[in-house]
Swiss-Prot record:
This is Large ribosomal subunit protein bL12. It comes from the Bacteria. GO terms for molecular function: mRNA binding; structural constituent of ribosome. Disulfide bonds: none annotated. The keyword S-adenosyl-L-methionine does not apply. The gene is rplL.
């Protein structure tokens, strides 16, 4: 790597989750791209190369949305912590998201990541669906 790219990488490593989230939003706006769409294209490629068409419906779904449907009021803080860690949102934004359930927590993520996040939220006291 060049010195410039190494310097940028080191700067990125020092960002907080909130700063990284803001950076992604700014990059999306500046370049007219979407981070979720880029990940989806990469994930769709292996499924597209795989088949003879017989197992189509099972392989077509490569992106999932994690939707917080509801949560146990006694577990609100636990659910809030999991949502904050997963999204990189600040406390106020994460609180608003959790309190406005049903609400999408993450969009367009891989099945394994979606199931893992669903399990985490459910263990914290939330009810989640994958779409």
């Amino acid at each position: 790597m060049s010195a410039k790219t190494e310097e940028i990488l080191e700067s990125l490593k020092s960002l907080s989750l909130l700063e990284a989230s803001e950076l992604v939003k700014q990059i999306e706006e500046a370049f007219g791209v979407s981070a979720a769409a880029s990940a989806g294209v990469v994930m769709a490629a292996p499924g597209a190369a795989g088949g003879d068409g017989d197992d189509g419906a099972a392989e077509e779904k490569t992106e999932f949305d994690v939707v917080l449907e509801s949560f146990d009021a006694a577990a609100k803080i636990k659910v809030l912590k999991v949502v904050r860690n997963a999204t990189g949102l600040g406390l106020g934004d994460a609180k608003t998201l959790v309190e406005s359930a049903p609400k999408t927590v993450k969009e367009g993520i891989a099945k394994a990541d979606a199931e893992s996040l669903k399990k985490e939220i459910e263990e914290a006291g939330g009810k989640v669906t994958l779409k």
